[in-house]
Amino acid sequence: MSKIIGIDLGTTNSCVAIMDGKTPKVIENAEGARTTPSVVAFLEDGERLIGQPAKRQAVTNPTNTLFAIKRLIGRTASDPVVEKDKGMVPYEIVKGPTGDAWVKAHGKDYSPQEVSAFILQKMKEAAEAHLGEPVTKAVITVPAYFNDAQRQATKDAGKIAGLEVLRIINEPTAAALAYGLDKNDGKKIAVYDLGGGTFDVSILEIGDGVFEVKSTNGDTFLGGEDFDLRIVDYLADEFKKEQGVDLRKDKLALQRLREEAEKAKKELSSTAQYEVNLPFISMNASGPLHLNIKLSRAKLEALVDDLIARTIGPCEQALKDAGLKKSDIDEVILVGGMSRMPKVQQAVQDFFGREPHKGVNPDEVVALGAAVQAGVLQGDVKDVLLLDVTPLTLGIETLGGVFTPLIERNTTIPTKRSQTFSTADDNQSAVTIRVFQGERPMAQDNKMLGQFDLVGIPPAPRGVPQIEVTFDIDANGIVQVHAKDKATNKEQSIRIQANGGLSDSDIERMVKEAEANKAADEKKKQLVEAKNQGEAILHSTEKALAEHGDKVGAAEKTAIETGITELKTALEGEDVEAIQAKTQALIQASMKLGEAMYAAQQGSAEGGDAKADDGVVDAEFEEVDDNKPAA
């Protein structure tokens, strides 16, 4: 059986590892480096460069050098995050055939999956060169907050690269696997993962080979790229003040600024000051212009202070969801290149009240963890059980636009949940199942993931058909939704994908607005519930009145008709109390009608019993046919 490899497909850098005996080991690439820049370049002659060679020539070929592609994977071209990204990168982002965000290089369009596949191929080739045999299977890591479309797109990238992706594993979970492989003492750890493009935090409990994720949170559009852009903007603004030229409008100059910004950021983790020196960055009528600016660590920290602060909210939420206090955390693991920044380390220490553990390599630990998971799947690593979670609540839209959860956030996966629903109208032959992800009570306030129709429901009064909706989340965090009509056994299902990704603002809005707007949400939900109850009573009363109205007196009938009219008027408004009051009034007014209906049913039932008794012969176990004349 060929070796299963573990790959950390990162925004900025990627890394590949394997299990060497009982220890995970990073494999060097063709250039002898342990990590590979996630950069792909296309040259004029059609040649394709990947990794460091691609990164080296970016300044001279900015429009055809693709980087930070992970930020686009699984997202639609109309996604606000993609719109924001268009102004940040020198290459062109275009709308793909299915509405997804694609990129253009030398006149050809590429999907993010294809570009990611080029990087995965380089990882695969490095592993094959090291092992001396073909590699066909892999475990690939993704941010914990990646949605279903992004996870599916990552699997597709693996497929394009010639890899069967046996498992998609969350990056912080992978880091915890690598950290805790040789530790059996029961520990609660926090993994703080600030990478090139995404931020995740996960709370885990480790003990006796069991790695149980208690909660996860994060931001899918926050990472080193954003830190670089703050430096780029600062340098460009300073140059514009001094020379009157905006370097952001020149793609070649912008690429040089980006490279220098990344270099400055790294240098300032170990030095107090860095001199940015870019000769011949631009020119004006009087000749060439040079950029020379001193950047201090203090200035950098001031520029990115709010970005670092944005990582603390998810940490608070993750602890809250895990039901833990800061003091309950035994160890904080730092992951991702940005966690090397002293200010980031200080922020983590200030929040958790303990110095973070720095014994793991933040650039390699995720790939090492992926290799451990690969070893588990291969059977080389025994007695390791990984229990991960789904990051956001999943559910469907029900009557009145209410979001009905089926699987709550931070539920251990794989998992399967079912619930039975019914129709809203008489003789309804089809239902539309709309799937949402989020934390708000109303569906429209959450992120819609997809929809599908269940057709061929036999005609029946509303509320009679039984439609079973099942959510199935596999170990990769990919969702499948089934709907089944219990009467006909007709089924329909959808694998959730391709509705654009969940941006940082989307996720923050879902969780934070859920707290801030709890009262308003509750009021809206109460209104929908009151209207649903009112309409149900109205419907049943009108039907009963039409069928049994002749069984009550004129006064009672008039009272019921008045109640119906008043409830209809109340239902047109937004006053919850008025709707509830008029609903109760109609229930009271129609009590006589209910008694008359009950009496009529009792009468017919007794008549039927009497007929049956006439035909009974007093003998043991003898069946009597009512239609046969009595002897």
Swiss-Prot record:
The modification Phosphothreonine is found at residue 198. Induction: By heat shock. Pfam families: HSP70. CDD domains: ASKHA_NBD_HSP70_DnaK-like. PROSITE patterns: HSP70_1, HSP70_2, HSP70_3. Keywords: ATP-binding, Chaperone, Nucleotide-binding, Phosphoprotein, Stress response. This is Chaperone protein DnaK. Acts as a chaperone. GO terms for molecular function: ATP binding; ATP-dependent protein folding chaperone; unfolded protein binding.
